Amino acid sequence: MLDIWPKLSQSPILQRFAWSPLIVGAYDRNRDLFELKTHRAPIPDALSENVTLPNYLGGLLVVHIRRGDFQGHCKYLQKQSCGYNAFNVFPEFSDRFEPPSDYWSRSTYYTDHCYPSSERIISKIESVRQNHGTIRRLYIMTNAKGSWLASLLAKLEQTASWDAITTSRDLNFTQEQGYASQALDALVAQRAEAFIGNGVSY
């Protein structure tokens, strides 16, 4: 998909892209999870066409941790020798996907990138945090089970001091907004100071 990016990036669908009032309203409902009080910009009525959103969520690191069906799906990706998908292979990105040829080393490599352990996740978070130096808040978007997520949060709090750690489970939606929860995650990740994604996840 990188071949089509120069044209796609100039297309009306991206040049004129804007978040819908539904998603803006969902953000406004949950903005305390993402913004520092001193950085908040007032948001008008969520149904207004003149709604403004913060362009940048300084100090916020967003992490996408996909679990659930991905445990089995990652094995399928290894079997098919799949790499990072779509735009996750931009040369500007620091992470590369270069699996070794040895089977067992390859299996470990896929697991680390596709379905990482808690320890691997925490190590990556700390690495990004140290490189930025200004990150103080963490938002985790995930479909992980509550017990696994609780264990990860406990380990994160033991590893370093955070001003706030929040997750997808902390979001509060109206019934209508709940159907578009992943779009809110995308909005927040787009504007965060830093984002750690899963390169093989769409």
What spans do the regions from the language model cover?
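Conserved blade-ending motifs and adjacent loop-strand segments that build the rim/top face
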Residues: D170-A180
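Core catalytic architecture of nucleotide-activated donor-dependent transferases building glycoconjugates
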Residues: M1-L171
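A donor-sugar binding/catalytic signature common to diverse glycosyltransferases
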Residues: A180-Y202
